[in-house]
């Protein structure tokens, strides 16, 4: 049993008159070019940990909208977010016990049937502490 638990969900974000609305994406959801996708990663940690790396892989049809790598602060947690071609990496010097939610937007750029990658997390100095999310397929039409 690992102290790390990951859950990854994709949401379709649509703008309405009352503001943005997000709806969960599943295997039956039909996406189209230009859609805005919100990635939500929920991380549960049952003990304090140091030097942890989380890698969120994405489908070839998705492009990140914020491409600048930077240090971020959120809910008392400091981490470095590094956006790359096929994945977004999160580096934690210190990861306190608790539950954390990370979100970032993606844009749909290609049609087809894709496997959206999994999210993995691992302690850099104690690799036996590792976990991963499940993958999901996405279908993109016109």
Spell out what each predicted region is.
Residues 1-142:
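C-terminal segments of large proteins
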